[in-house]
């Protein structure tokens, strides 16, 4: 049970791969990668199934997607535990992820009807009708940080629109993908409508470059996303939706309740061990006594964050990072900032060799003239002190990314000023910047995406509009155009 093609499970024909629990280094899944021939078979299966799937109609497709929702409900404990073991996230957090997967069904159905349904109006020229059709065969590339929820956010709207899908998950979370697809199978999805190919870079390249793809929906790193954008640049007929990362700023200004502000900072920077694309990476705090008090409370709170394995009791706030390699990468990022002049207020440390367990870090980088514009994808928050609000906003905008940004401030006028000037696709006020609504679009500008917002707007990139002018019969106009005679 490694690859799912044409409604059947197949062993891979490539090289051996394994999935490792990053909290204890135990192997929890093994398999073989898909070869280019198996990728071809998956695309062929999706192509063969696509028209019949579209012709079922929306209501019939929705019924099957609803059956999948029922499977998620019935298996939510197993799915949450699988996500926890494979990602290292605490059980409380993976239960929330499964809940989001379940909620995605109703939200996607509502989005389909609101954004890509059918609308007809009578005009003097005839009946004007707007309809939407699926692109055809699309690939979904999933990330490791939300291995259920994020690919689910592409797959569900794609299927509702009438597309067929080849799903290529992160090579770090194959077990979650296998379980997800098995639930689709139990839901009665017709053969070929959803196919799963597991693998690493070679598998991904074989799928992304396949000539029979009509589109690709990607969530992941900016580096990979930019590579895909270059690859698709000469193919205007293919739809490409990119959701990438961010170097996200959070500004604090004039907040009286500093304990509440510290809570929102912790939730913004350290949830999921800092492995959310919307996590705060840069924190801007005013110079002065109030700012000093906030930083002192923040540093103390960061030191108290509980870190532990996914199944620890009592449950930790932070689990493991995705791998030991990722953990070591965060230590290296911190060292780089220290060498540039940063001063660690709370040092990030690798807690246990062979695992992805790290403690959270807080580093004052005010003395660094030019901060590296990098997405350090982990629990390391960079602190900058500022003297005036315009300076803070200017510094916040000094990034090639533009995913999320936030302001904690008691003044509505300050928020309006900030909202008008900040450059990001998600802008929150007095809320953690990792909080996003599935009933709203999700996406960014700059290096964070290619203007294909997901979540509620995923329906937009899953279908294309068809405009028609229609009449029940051919009819001769009352007056012919000049120069015509009949």
Swiss-Prot record:
Gene, per the UniProt record: astD
Which species? Shewanella baltica (strain OS185)
Which top class of enzyme applies to this chain? oxidoreductase
- The active site lies at 243, 277
What domain of life does the UniProt record list for this protein's source?
A: Bacteria
* Pfam families in the record: Aldedh
Per its record, what are the GO molecular function terms?
succinylglutamate-semialdehyde dehydrogenase activity
GO biological process annotation, one example: arginine catabolic process to succinate
Please report the name of this protein according to its UniProt entry.
Answer: N-succinylglutamate 5-semialdehyde dehydrogenase
């Amino acid at each position: 049970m490694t690859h799912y093609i044409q409604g059947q499970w197949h062993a891979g024909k490539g090289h051996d791969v394994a999935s490792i629990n990053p909290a204890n280094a135990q192997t929890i899944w093994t398999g073989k990668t898909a070869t280019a021939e198996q990728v071809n078979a998956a695309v062929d299966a999706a192509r063969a199934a696509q028209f019949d799937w579209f012709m079922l109609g929306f209501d019939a497709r929705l019924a099957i997607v609803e059956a999948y929702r029922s499977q998620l409900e019935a298996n939510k404990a197993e799915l949450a535990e699988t996500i926890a073991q494979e990602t290292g996230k605490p059980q409380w957090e993976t239960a929330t992820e499964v809940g989001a997967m379940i909620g995605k069904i109703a939200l996607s159905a509502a989005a389909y009807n609101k954004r890509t349904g059918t609308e007809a109006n009578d005009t003097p020229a005839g009946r004007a009708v707007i309809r939407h059709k699926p692109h055809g065969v699309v690939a979904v590339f999933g990330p490791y940080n939300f291995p259920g929820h994020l690919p689910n956010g592409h797959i569900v709207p794609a299927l509702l629109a009438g597309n067929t899908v080849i799903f290529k998950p992160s090579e770090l979370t194959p077990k979650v993908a296998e379980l997800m697809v098995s639930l689709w199978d139990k839901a009665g999805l017709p053969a070929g409508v959803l196919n799963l190919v597991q693998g690493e870079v070679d598998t991904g390249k074989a799928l992304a470059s396949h000539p029979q793809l009509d589109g690709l929906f990607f969530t992941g790193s900016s580096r990979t996303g930019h590579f895909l954008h270059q690859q698709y640049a000469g193919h205007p007929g293919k739809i490409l939706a990119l959701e990438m990362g961010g170097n996200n700023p959070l500004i604090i200004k004039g907040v009286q309740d500093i304990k509440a502000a510290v809570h929102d900072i912790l939730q913004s920077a350290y949830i999921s061990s800092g492995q959310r694309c919307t996590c705060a990476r840069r924190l801007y705090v005013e110079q002065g006594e109030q700012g000093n008090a906030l930083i002192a409370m923040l540093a103390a709170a960061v030191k108290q964050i509980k870190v532990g394995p996914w199944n620890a009791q009592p449950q930790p706030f932070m689990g493991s990072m995705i791998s030991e390699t990722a953990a070591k990468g965060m230590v290296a990022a911190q060292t780089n900032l220290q060498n540039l002049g940063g001063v660690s207020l709370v040092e990030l440390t690798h807690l246990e060799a062979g695992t992805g367990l790290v403690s959270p870090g807080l580093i004052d980088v005010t003395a660094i003239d030019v901060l590296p514009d990098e997405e350090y994808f982990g629990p390391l928050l960079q602190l900058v002190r500022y003297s005036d609000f315009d300076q803070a906003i200017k510094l916040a905008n000094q990034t090639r990314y533009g995913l999320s940004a936030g302001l904690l401030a008691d003044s509505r006028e300050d928020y309006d000023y900030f909202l008008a000037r900040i450059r990001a696709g998600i802008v929150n006020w007095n809320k953690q910047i990792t909080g996003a609504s599935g009933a709203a679009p999700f996406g960014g500008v700059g290096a964070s995406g290619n203007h294909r917002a997901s979540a509620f707007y995923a329906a937009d990139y899953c279908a294309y509009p068809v405009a028609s002018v229609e009449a029940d019969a051919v009819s001769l106009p009352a007056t012919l155009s000049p120069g015509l005679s009949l």
